[in-house]
Regions:
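Structural signature of Gram-negative outer-membrane beta-barrels, strongest in the C-terminal barrel
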Residues: 1-47, 95, 105, 150, ...
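Short, low-complexity, polar/charged sequence segments that are solvent-exposed and flexible
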Residues: 34-37, 56-60, 120-123, 176
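Gram-negative outer-membrane beta-barrel transporters
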Residues: 43-45, 69-182
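Surface-exposed extracellular loop regions of Gram-negative outer-membrane beta-barrel proteins
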Residues: 1-23, 43-74, 172-184
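Generic domain-boundary/flexible-linker signal
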Residues: 37-38, 50, 113, 180
Length: 185
């Protein structure tokens, strides 16, 4: 993410900083002849991340507010994220051939601070003008991160035949997934 659009120009991402990640997790593991369990708590803080996305926009960066289309790079810098939660995994050998498994995860994946937004307009760069437009602060603090469920669970049964074949089935539950938002609106 060092260049806003490396295919088109040599514009370096403004206010670029090294991303830092701080993580910790702790687990408790139980192993018995027929039963296995694992409980894990986790925490992760990501600071100064950069995300670049591309789209066509009307009137972005133009002084006259025209409706011409232009291809822009949306550059969001200074993104801070916080991920924390717990996971549980269980396995029970019901018989010598049948095993039950269960897993669950509950987490909170949020943006922990606001970020900065700029766009890189390829049409302005082609004309030799400054391609960057500063849109200021993006108010994303406490918004949930997109693309992952905050809650997940799974239950499964497995049959292992003594003649070296097996079959299994799982039922999954996913909840509290959030879609991505438009930073520029």
């Amino acid at each position: 993410n060092s260049f806003s659009n490396a295919r088109m120009n040599n514009v370096i991402t403004p206010e670029l900083q090294s991303e830092s990640i701080t993580s910790a997790d702790a687990s408790y593991i139980l192993r018995a002849p027929k039963f296995k369990a694992r409980l894990t708590g986790f925490y992760s803080k990501i600071q100064d991340a950069t995300e670049i996305s591309f789209f066509y926009g009307e009137g972005i960066g133009s002084d006259d507010g025209g409706d011409e289309d232009t291809f822009v790079s949306e550059i969001v810098t200074g993104i801070d994220k916080q991920n924390m939660g717990a996971e549980l995994g269980l396995e029970y050998q019901i018989t010598s051939t049948i095993k039950a498994t269960a897993a669950a995860s509950y987490g909170q994946y949020i943006y922990s601070d606001n970020a900065k937004l700029k766009t890189n307009d390829d049409a302005l760069a082609a004309e030799g003008n400054s391609p960057l437009t500063d849109f200021g602060t993006v108010y994303i603090k406490d918004y949930h991160q997109p693309g992952m469920p905050q809650t997940a669970a799974s239950f499964g049964l497995e049959y292992r035949d003594p003649h070296f074949w097996w079959v299994g089935a799982n039922v999954n539950y996913l909840a509290n997934s959030y879609i991505d938002f438009a930073n520029i609106l």
